[in-house]
Amino acid sequence: YCDDCFNAFANINDSSVDLIITSPPYNLGNNHHTGNKKHQAYNDNLPEKEYQETQIKLLNECFRVLKEDGSMIYNHKNRIKKGVQISPYEWLFKSKFVIKQELVWINRSQNFDKIRFYPWTERIYWLTKNPKTKLINTINKHDVFDWNEWKPVGTRGLHTRAFPEKFVA
């Protein structure tokens, strides 16, 4: 689908999807373009309450379409708003999902901040409907992985934080 996610969800049956992988906009306070002229810009500067409510709505729609034994991989990061850190846990706990595991992705940002330690990590959450859902770890990885191990491919400079394809393959 290439559509607003809430429009697309209307066309997906309940409990019909095995795996969902997403990395939503982080609400960092900018207007972004995809780098592709046929895609429109999106506003990444919602009031925090509205952003979190939208994330909960998104997560609950994913929950609806996910099969009982399915999994969701949700990539997000801790953010700083008005000088205070905001964790994705603030809205993940308000969704219907079970948080099976939190993975730490070291992506080594080259940015720096003169007033705090600059984050080099993002989080990847493994979410399920059922706490008994299991993972078969065929890639023999741990819960912390380094950006340098899995470089994203095929981005051609259009997306600086592309998700490593090897992780989901």
Language-model-detected regions and their locations in the chain:
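Core catalytic lobe of class I
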Residues: 1-169
